[in-house]
Amino acid sequence: MSGTSKESLGHGGLPGLGKTCLTTMDTKLNMLNEKVDQLLHFQEDVTEKLQSMCRDMGHLERGLHRLEASRAPGPGGADGVPHIDTQAGWPEVLELVRAMQQDAAQHGARLEALFRMVAAVDRAIALVGATFQKSKVADFLMQGRVPWRRGSPGDSPEENKERVEEEGGKPKHVLSTSGVQSDAREPGEESQKADVLEGTAERLPPIRASGLGADPAQAVVSPGQGDGVPGPAQAFPGHLPLPTKVEAKAPETPSENLRTGLELAPAPGRVNVVSPSLEVAPGAGQGASSSRPDPEPLEEGTRLTPGPGPQCPGPPGLPAQARATHSGGETPPRISIHIQEMDTPGEMLMTGRGSLGPTLTTEAPAAAQPGKQGPPGTGRCLQAPGTEPGEQTPEGARELSPLQESSSPGGVKAEEEQRAGAEPGTRPSLARSDDNDHEVGALGLQQGKSPGAGNPEPEQDCAARAPVRAEAVRRMPPGAEAGSVVLDDSPAPPAPFEHRVVSVKETSISAGYEVCQHEVLGGGRFGQVHRCTEKSTGLPLAAKIIKVKSAKDREDVKNEINIMNQLSHVNLIQLYDAFESKHSCTLVMEYVDGGELFDRITDEKYHLTELDVVLFTRQICEGVHYLHQHYILHLDLKPENILCVNQTGHQIKIIDFGLARRYKPREKLKVNFGTPEFLAPEVVNYEFVSFPTDMWSVGVITYMLLSGLSPFLGETDAETMNFIVNCSWDFDADTFEGLSEEAKDFVSRLLVKEKSCRMSATQCLKHEWLNNLPAKASRSKTRLKSQLLLQKYIAQRKWKKHFYVVTAANRLRKFPTSP
């Protein structure tokens, strides 16, 4: 039986309801097709109207130029009679002047309303200012100084200088997570000052952040401190004590001056509150060690402060105790805010008088780089304050934060003698136990000895730990080195010019552009791409020279121009200008110098990780998603048509829209072109193509990025197409061994023979493999640039808040105790 008879029987066998449904569906599809065509025609009409408007504006501009030229006095224009053509243009000029007058009146009304608004705001500000002027506290906070304290015994040139620095109010250092210390001197405890002036010093037990409310009455006063003369157990400024481990149950004798987490002040009534960082400072030149092991890990802000709190002014040659006796007067209570910084080389310290001064620190850059830290149990000796720059410790051996130098309150002469007799090996250093036991958190300072004392144990300890540190650096896990790798996940930069609607010009490109014929950026079946520069602006661009042999070739070029005129996306190349000649057409486009993505795949020196492929694939899907939203099929997606913005980043741009087509629902589009190994089965079978055709190519590109292999490549084009038609591919066991199941699922859902079963671009962007980038980066021991920028922004905001708090507290401490 013939095919015609079968068809007639088939139609006759259908029920009437089915025929009605098919007819209704065809009618609706026809209506939808007509609406899409109407939209396209409307868009073309709008484009034509805009172009005609531009032409009219050009004509108007030329008319104005002619009018200005006619008003200028000519050689024979003494009679002042206007020309006939000039008189014809006067009515239009009058209309334009009237329109300008109306616009000026409208703008004047708007400016008047804006002026009234500004006047109201000025009155409100004046009211607020008057309210603040009546407030004594607000006036003090705004000015930052107290007039009635001028000339008080507590003022000094140093304090005046610090006030000037405070009035500037500009932050000079970046502040990371910092602890705040407040030192308060109670008026009721001034009676104990005599004990301190006689040479006594207090020994306070260690206080953690949880014990901020410790009673200062528990302080034990121990003699042994003279009036500045170094005692037998005192350390010199150049001969600072070495830290060592301290037993958990060490006896506390009155001769010791132990202090962990508290600052030794000249007055016994001064109580230091440490939260949450620990500040270690030897008081009055004595070494200090921890009285019991601290189970909590040390904060990054642990520092060795240079001196014991604020000192009263006096002769510079006197010791601290003598200067305190010299001032004599009673000092009102003060609050000292200590800010600890770990992000910048210079540290900012709010001293007892509220100054912002740099402190001497021993920087440990590895504290801010977790990827370069060694294991927690690794023993390490921190660089001494007097160490030369060439004597720095290895980066892998640093984990604790910098310590500040400690200074002795002795006189200048005694200080010079002590510095002369000091040994290089007796500088302060921070030690941590090598075994990972409960002594890891113990921190101590051991009294340094003179050369005659013969106690080289701390120096030998550091020397013995040197090979251990080197071995620890060698045994660092590979993830520690990878922790410093930062991946740029920022979006691709936009074109250096605004999106424009380009029309073909029938002039030579050499009139406005300088084409570098010797510099070829790429090429293909169409011709070559050269680098060019716009003469008027110097803008670097790319000139795509297409050979034209027939009218069909010109239509293809115009189709490419029309498609690129509708594209404005950061992942799609932008068109800048177009020229047409007898034998060629030239498209001037955006220039990127990162090379083809295909070069990244084939380059043996460049190692693509799975996270790199995720960043590339996500941007490809974003560009394809934009194309499909505008009913455009690329139909030639391959690594050669994807350019990288730079040599190292992950930003890409899709190029070559020569084979792109506009998709229409009722139009059965068939194509028989493209690169064989990237063709979809429907293209090989010469069937209807649609959006899933591009998604097949995305799947092939992703497979190549992950493995470096082509899934369907055969020895010949015929074999390749046979593999594609049968959809015969698999995951190579060697290349896909370490890849995640999410990546395999992503590829498997794209390389499907049935095009209706493939993922769309929207579904790809929602796939689990292309999302949760921070979690994937943390698993691969890398960091994302977006995370670093976010952390930097948060740190800046936190720094500003802390700076304002410190400034306000530093001013509030200057209030007198009684009105």
UniProtKB/Swiss-Prot annotation:
Domain Protein kinase: 515-770
EC number: 2.7.11.18
Record-annotated active site: D636
Domain of life: Eukaryota
Keywords assigned: ATP-binding, Cytoplasm, Kinase, Magnesium, Nucleotide-binding, Phosphoprotein, Serine/threonine-protein kinase, Transferase
An example molecular function term from Gene Ontology annotations: myosin light chain kinase activity
Residues the entry annotates as binding ATP: L521, G522, G523, G524, R525, F526, G527, Q528, V529, K544
Pfam families on file: Pkinase (PF00069)
Cited SMART domains: S_TKc
UniProt PTM: Phosphorylated on serine residues.
GO cellular component: actin cytoskeleton; cytoplasm; cytosol
Catalytic function, reaction form: L-seryl-[myosin light chain] + ATP = O-phospho-L-seryl-[myosin light chain] + ADP + H(+); L-threonyl-[myosin light chain] + ATP = O-phospho-L-threonyl-[myosin light chain] + ADP + H(+)
InterPro entries according to UniProt: Kinase-like_dom_sf, Prot_kinase_dom, Protein_kinase_ATP_BS, Ser/Thr_kinase_AS
Residues spanning the membrane: none
Comp. bias intervals (Pro residues): 307-318
Principal location: cytoplasm
Similarity-based family: Belongs to the protein kinase superfamily. CAMK Ser/Thr protein kinase family.
Designated name of the protein: Myosin light chain kinase 3
Protein species of origin: Homo sapiens (Human)
Gene from which this protein is expressed: MYLK3
